[in-house]
Amino acid sequence: MTDTFWAFVGLVLFLALLVYFEVPEMVLRHLDTRAKRIKDELDEALRLREEAQEVLAEYQRKHAEAEKDAQEIIAAAKREVEAVISEARIKAEEYVKNRNKLAEQKIAQAEADAIRMVSSSAIDLAVSAARVLIEKELDSHKANELIKESLVQESLTKMKTYLN
């Protein structure tokens, strides 16, 4: 009996002991458990990946939507600014027109007042000159009658001028 034979017998006995103590089943159970755990981890990783892709797609959709909303807000703000500028320009033009019209009215009123004042002064001067001439040429009784008559005429003329 050789050493090889005894080594073979030792190996067979060792394997028989392993089978007797159910070591192969324990190893298989352990490997099955480990394989199941790895499979579960892979399934979880796939689920998480799909969830991450869904979240990414949702984020990208929301980002695109937010970008679109921002563009709409900017466009609306630009339209509003243009409307405000246009309205301000129109109001400024109206203000300038009104101020010019008011200035023209004031100038026309000042011209009319100046003409009335000059006319009134000319009338007063003419009446005074006529009074002086009449007083020199007429007696006092006749002069008073003519002055009264001319004053009445002058008053009527002034009233017509002021009323017109």
Swiss-Prot record:
Entries under InterPro entries matching the protein: ATP_synth_b/b'su_bac/chlpt, ATP_synthase_B_chain
GO cellular component, one term: proton-transporting ATP synthase complex
One Pfam family of this chain: ATP-synt_B
This protein's UniProt keywords: ATP synthesis, Cell inner membrane, Cell membrane, CF(0), Hydrogen ion transport, Ion transport, Membrane, Transmembrane, Transmembrane helix, Transport
Membrane spanning stretches: 4-24
Membrane disposition: Single-pass membrane protein
GO function term, MF aspect, one: proton-transporting ATPase activity, rotational mechanism
Subcellular location as annotated: Cell inner membrane
The keyword S-adenosyl-L-methionine is annotated on this UniProt entry: no
Major subcellular location class: membrane
Subunit relationships: F-type ATPases have 2 components, F(1) - the catalytic core - and F(0) - the membrane proton channel. F(1) has five subunits: alpha(3), beta(3), gamma(1), delta(1), epsilon(1). F(0) has three main subunits: a(1), b(2) and c(10-14). The alpha and beta chains form an alternating ring which encloses part of the gamma chain. F(1) is attached to F(0) by a central stalk formed by the gamma and epsilon chains, while a peripheral stalk is formed by the delta and b chains.
Database matches in NCBIfam families: PRK09173.1
Family from the record: Belongs to the ATPase B chain family.
Function: F(1)F(0) ATP synthase produces ATP from ADP in the presence of a proton or sodium gradient. F-type ATPases consist of two structural domains, F(1) containing the extramembraneous catalytic core and F(0) containing the membrane proton channel, linked together by a central stalk and a peripheral stalk. During catalysis, ATP synthesis in the catalytic domain of F(1) is coupled via a rotary mechanism of the central stalk subunits to proton translocation.
Protein name in UniProt: ATP synthase subunit b 2
